[in-house]
Amino acid sequence: MHHQAKRLPAISASGIGSLNRQACAVQHALRFLKDFILFAEKEEELQKLILRQHQTAAVDKVVARALDPQRTRGLVWHTPGSGKTYTMIKTAELLFKANEAQKPTILLMIDRNELEDQMLKNLASVGLANVAHADRIATLNKLLDERGQDYRGIIVTMIHKFRDLPANLNTRKNIFVLIDEAHRTTGGDLGNFLMAELPNATFIGFTGTPVDKTAYGKGTVQDG
């Protein structure tokens, strides 16, 4: 007895496009669940936080820019209260996990003591490993010294800890410096010290202050 093979129905070009869109939507959703949901301490409670569109877009653009060897400067502007801290945390996490970064060092630069403590609590809540707190100049020097510990991971510190450190302390290229309130922390001598001590690092500024299109704002990390 002969059975004729059944053929699958042909799929039109529009049908293929629809399947592609569905596949992309699934991939996008899975990636969102993996990369853009975090748990962090807020109002003394551990809460689930979902990054908003402006945050996810900023994270992706900063990571892509930081991994481009031709572009070592950048600036992210979030309006006050729009989640700049969590954008920084997720950027640090994805940079640290990126294979292209080759076991990097990521500096989270905070400008006030109370924000430094909050950043450490949030990093602990997110569950990130390889987090160090450089609360003293000597500790920062030890962590960064290319001839010494040459720490690979995330370092939370404040920019004034960079005073009195030697030039060319670490010349690796896979050092990423994420600077909170860059408009007021990178101007003057402290900013010069920072860039002299890490001459090949990538510097990404984060600010809640609008940037003038012509002057770029005094003390900010400029696009480059």
Annotated model-derived regions:
Residues 98-101, 147-149, 168-171, 195-200:
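Conserved catalytic network of the ASCE P-loop NTPase/AAA+ motor domain
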Residues 99-104, 131-134, 215-224:
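Flexible phosphate/Mg2+-sensing switch loops adjacent to catalytic phosphate-binding sites
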Residues 1, 171-224:
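Signature of the SF2 helicase/ATPase Hel1-core->accessory helical subdomain module
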Residues 82-86, 114-118, 163-165, 184-187, ...:
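Flexible loop/turn segments at secondary-structure boundaries
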Residues 138-155, 168-169:
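Conserved motor-coupling elements within RecA-like helicase/translocase cores
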Residues 1-105, 110, 114-130, 153-154, ...:
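ATP-dependent helicase/translocase motor core
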Residues 113, 134-143, 158-164:
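Conserved helicase motor
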